[in-house]
Curated annotation (Swiss-Prot):
Residues 1-76 form the Ubiquitin-like domain. It comes from Eimeria bovis. The lineage of its organism: Eukaryota, Sar, Alveolata, Apicomplexa, Conoidasida. GO terms for cellular component: cytoplasm; nucleus; ribonucleoprotein complex; ribosome. GO terms for biological process: translation. There is a cross-link at residue 76 (Glycyl lysine isopeptide (Gly-Lys) (interchain with K-? in acceptor proteins)). InterPro entries: Ribosomal_eL40_dom, Ribosomal_eL40_sf, Ribosomal_zn-bd, Ubiquitin-like_dom, Ubiquitin-like_domsf, Ubiquitin_CS, Ubiquitin_dom, Ubiquitin_ubiquitin-like. It comes from the Eukaryota. This is Ubiquitin-ribosomal protein eL40 fusion protein. GO terms for molecular function: structural constituent of ribosome. Keywords: Cytoplasm, Isopeptide bond, Nucleus, Ribonucleoprotein, Ribosomal protein, Ubl conjugation.
């Protein structure tokens, strides 16, 4: 049978599937056509997100049904080498005790006028792990 997959860009993909096909199989077919890895795909039908282990017939998906493809949001973790680089630039700074401006590590006076270019600087506190 034939089903349609509509992307967020409005593009419609046609797939030839069987009712016994799993959602994983459908995602693999989408990867073959579009090059989107299955772990980044979320398929929606009738307002429900489809789970990988289930079949098309479990969701009552029939011929010429339309599934909606949404890409999974990624984030939340930083590669260790990038975290080290970020800590070097963000954590080894000095802070003005009067205006709380962030200053370079070797600064001796604040660069802001509002605190009168004070020399009262402290090292930035280390983040709690």
């Amino acid at each position: 049978m034939q089903i349609f997959v509509k992307t967020l860009t409005g593009k419609t993909i046609t797939l030839d599937v069987e009712p016994s096909d799993t959602i994983e199989n459908v995602k693999a077919k989408i990867q073959d056509k579009e090059g989107i890895p299955p772990d980044q795909q979320r398929l929606i039908f009738a307002g429900k997100q489809l789970e990988d282990g289930r079949t098309l017939s479990d969701y009552n998906i029939q011929k010429e049904s339309t599934l909606h493809l949404v890409l999974r949001l990624r984030g939340g973790i930083i590669e260790p080498s990038l975290a080290l680089l970020a800590s070097k630039y963000n954590c080894e700074k000095k802070i003005c005790r009067k205006c709380y401006a962030r200053l370079p590590p070797r600064a001796t006076n604040c660069r802001k006028k509002k605190c009168g270019h004070t020399s009262q600087l402290r090292p930035k506190k280390k983040p709690k792990n």
